[in-house]
Swiss-Prot record:
GO terms for cellular component: cytoplasm. This is Pantothenate kinase. ATP binds at G109, S110, V111, A112, V113, G114, K115, S116. It catalyses: (R)-pantothenate + ATP = (R)-4'-phosphopantothenate + ADP + H(+). It comes from Rhizobium rhizogenes (strain K84 / ATCC BAA-868) (Agrobacterium radiobacter). CDD domains: PanK. SUPFAM superfamilies: P-loop containing nucleoside triphosphate hydrolases. The keyword ATP-binding applies. Keywords: ATP-binding, Coenzyme A biosynthesis, Cytoplasm, Kinase, Nucleotide-binding, Transferase. Pathway: Cofactor biosynthesis; coenzyme A biosynthesis; CoA from (R)-pantothenate: step 1/5. Its EC number is 2.7.1.33.
């Protein structure tokens, strides 16, 4: 573990990954982090990791050993501590027969940074703990407004920005989860048609752990002038993770993924982006660069990256798309 002592000259230069001595985080190299695995067993196979990873994500079994087994152990300790606190509070309140509400893990980060892979890997590792907890995974994509509504609000070019989400529905969902309600429905989203699927839902029925993944899940909200109470999505999290990387790396991963999709998913006639499959490579590259510059880069700078310091754990990736550094918030 390393903690440097260099002092920044202005607040604007602050970067938690410069490892300032006064930082609220501990910083670890992957080698240091891997040692925290202890005796945590590897319960995934190479084939399973390949199946779980997203397009362009090179995560393999070695990366699971280096990063995810220690993370699994850390999360296990947090879940166990939460259970102990739950039991102590029940004794304090003289409550009997009360079920514990789900432990919610939030995963945030830019488009194309690898959030979905991390979420799927964690889900499989956590559900294979000796206690066999019930683990569900929900993404925020389903809480986007349907395209018709985005068009009505003139927000199609800001899809993925905070205002493009039905925040009220999202908060109702998380409130129901944390209230311990059964059969809570989350809307489904199709990346093929690039839209919310009407009348299609995923039912979440009182899991032990819920992983909630999305680009803006750590986003704070402006306090209203009328003084009304405004909850934030992260208020419902028991633990939060931010997947981080340099801006230029995410840019490259996004464009590379777009060009690969042009050769695969975009060729499906039902794809929203089918029109991009028949244009020239140069034209497609120009479109990908435009989408990055005009939408995703702006969202990263304005809304996503500023939420990074709110995470309990930050996984920072290098140019090979693998994690190179870990930051864990101090208690």
């Amino acid at each position: 573990m390393t903690i440097a002592t260099k002092t920044p000259t202005t607040p604007e230069t602050l970067d938690i990954f410069q490892a300032k001595a006064y930082s609220p985080y501990y910083f670890f190299s992957t080698e240091e982090w891997a040692k925290f695995r202890a005796d945590t067993p590897l319960t995934l196979t190479a084939d399973e990791v390949t199946r779980l990873r997203s397009m362009g994500d090179p995560i393999d079994l070695d990366e699971v050993r280096r990063i995810y087994l220690s993370l699994s152990r850390l999360l296990s300790s947090h879940v166990e501590s939460s259970q102990i606190l739950f039991e102590q509070r029940n004794r304090f309140l003289s409550l009997n027969g009360v079920a514990k509400t789900p432990f919610v893990i939030g995963i945030a980060g830019s488009v194309a940074v690898g959030k979905s892979t991390t979420a799927r890997i964690l889900k499989e590792l956590l559900r294979r703990w000796p206690s066999s907890p019930k683990v569900d995974l929900i993404t925020t994509d389903g809480f986007l407004y349907p395209n018709a509504e985005l068009q009505r609000r003139n927000l199609m070019q800001r899809k993925g920005f905070p205002e493009s989400y039905d925040t009220a529905a999202l908060l109702r969902f998380l409130s129901a989860i944390k209230a311990g309600q059964p059969d809570v429905k989350a809307p489904c989203y199709s990346h093929l048609v690039y839209d919310v699927l009407p009348s299609e839902y995923k039912t979440v029925d009182r899991p032990d752990i819920l992983i909630f993944e999305g680009i803006n899940v750590l986003q704070s909200r402006h306090l209203p002038a009328d003084g009304k109470i405004v909850p934030m999505v992260s208020d419902f999290f028991d633990f939060s993770i931010y997947i981080d990387a340099d801006e230029d790396l995410i840019h490259n991963w996004y464009v590379t993924r777009f060009m690969r999709l042009r050769e695969t998913a975009f060729r499906d006639p039902h794809s929203f982006f089918h029109r991009y499959a028949s244009i020239t490579e140069e034209e497609a590259l120009g479109i990908a660069e435009g989408l990055w510059k005009n939408i995703n880069l702006k969202n990263l700078r304005q809304n996503i990256l500023p939420t990074r310091p709110r995470a309990d754990l930050i996984l920072r990736k290098g140019k090979n798309h693998l994690i190179e550094q870990v930051a864990l918030r101090k208690l």
